[in-house]
Amino acid sequence: LRPLENKDINENYLSWINNTKENFYVESTKFPTSNYALNNYYETSLKSKNSILFAICNKKGTHIGNCSISQIDWINRKCIYGRMIGDKKNSPGGAGTQALQLLQRYAFYHLNLNLIWTGVCKKNIKSIKSNLRAGMKNVGKIPEALFINNIYEDVLIFSITKKQYHKINS
């Protein structure tokens, strides 16, 4: 992981966001995004004290995806995370899980947060397995929270606390 930089806001990134077939379950891909909107999102995020954007890179340093910590609650020490592998052909297997593990370490030990959570469509099996491999626990669900292909789908909630993370990684 490295900080997302202005040079990363390019046609490749835009094509990932607009690829609804490959990123079917990523909510930010539901509507077409323009270059202007993507740049605005990046600039707004840079100014925020409650979100941090990262580039996911392969071993060659190629930008293959993004992840974020957002809605940081500095009082209750918690945040939501999101991630997307956009360049699947240059992505080694397990890149999403590894990125999540690095994100967890950063959130717990650099930001001193206590809880990380996310919501995942129950049909997104790849993401569910990745969350479980990274030590996240399925702690509940929100019924019929997503409308996909004319069907309401449940969202599964995954979380991990600093104590759980430390127990797994010590």
Predicted regions mapped to residue ranges:
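Conserved GNAT-fold acetyl-CoA-binding loop/helix
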Residues: 21-42
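A short helix-loop-beta-strand connector motif used in the catalytic cores of GNAT acetyltransferases and
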Residues: 43-55
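Hydrophobic pocket/interface hotspot
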Residues: 12-13, 22, 38, 81
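Residue-level marker of structural boundaries
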Residues: 18-22, 31, 47, 163
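Acyl-donor (CoA/ACP) binding surface of acyl/acetyltransferases
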Residues: 2-9, 19, 53, 58-170
